[in-house]
């Protein structure tokens, strides 16, 4: 198991370096610059700003300088929000985004797995049909559709929850964004659990257990559930990536001060360092959670770690 873990951990650093390098050159080579929207600037003032931020240097030198600063934990200053460094903005937004993402994933697991189990145990019944219909609907509707719909129903018509904004410690501001972000993941986890559990029910060792008179629920909890959850565990990594990308839309729709909203603002304003900082944060989170999913999968399935 340790060798398997070291092998997985060793792949994280070069992957992160590729993400940093690709993001740096894509951002810098994109049309426009951080000061192009400021029409009142004279050419001399703009040249002075470029020199102050090192944007007048060749892109290869800018890249080397950025890596050197990054090695010391310095993400650089924000070009647009000049009173803040990128580290300050990450420190402000990361707790909000982390709480949003972790809660959405936890909600998806706590709801999606029981729904999938119920649909598999009572397959081809009205319960199965109802769950399957909701699953298809949840997968089909993207966050930028479900978010405004939920805000319209529960925020405007019923006035149960706020439709936007953020107050520290106020859970009611978190309900609609978390549900919006979690719904597609709940649907996919439920579908994956149902199909995987039905496959396990058709396996030879389950048939043997039934022939020996083992009860239905003992077969489910004692024999079938653990192997059926292996595909669900492997999906946690892609689900994390989905939640990360989905948070960009959700935080913008509901006005949450998270890293996703800062990333969107940075991309619009061509704030190079802010975009890079947020991309690195998101890339690191996705890689670490994928690593965690791989380790859990290897612990559950010995065949994987011995390959």
Show which residues each predicted segment covers.
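Hydrophobic aliphatic residues
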Residues: 26, 30, 38-42, 70-71, ...
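Juxtamembrane/transmembrane-helix interface segments of polytopic membrane transporters
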Residues: 19, 23-27, 147, 151, ...
